[in-house]
């Protein structure tokens, strides 16, 4: 969302509790976010879980995470269950989508969103927010795989880089995920990559897969 769009929504939401979302972005604070959904197509996907963790002054606040499970959507089928291992019975106590979004906005505020394939998550959340609340998320996006690629590309132009989250974490000597396709684990992994790449040393350039 550009500055003009942000200003438009800021004035349109006068008197709304959501107006501060479109004010100036907080500096030094970020939120790493991930969603589990029912499809890889953002126009068809429905939310299953949403998880996030704050990054404040380069510290990942894992002691106060955000995590919600939604009611099982109609499109939750065997194909999506194979990916994230979340079944209908696992969502028996899930909350409705609008309530989940309200909780998420209270947690995130207008902080930039960090993530792995974060544009996919943002697209789905935008569609849901427009449907229930009437506006898209204003949050700037930070893609950790792009930061990783750009840092290495400057020193190893035309090399091949494995941009999977597991490969990035392994190369950066970060903890490997125990549960793949777990929203909170993915959010924490993306946060670790972000802090490592923005505040740590340059990653090792001795890559077995460069060419």
Walk through the language-model features, giving the residues of each:
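Short, glycine/acidic-enriched loop or turn micro-motifs at the edges of active sites
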Residues: 37-39, 146, 189
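Conserved non-catalytic scaffold segment of RNase H-like nuclease domains
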Residues: 3-31, 36-126, 130-131, 135-139, ...
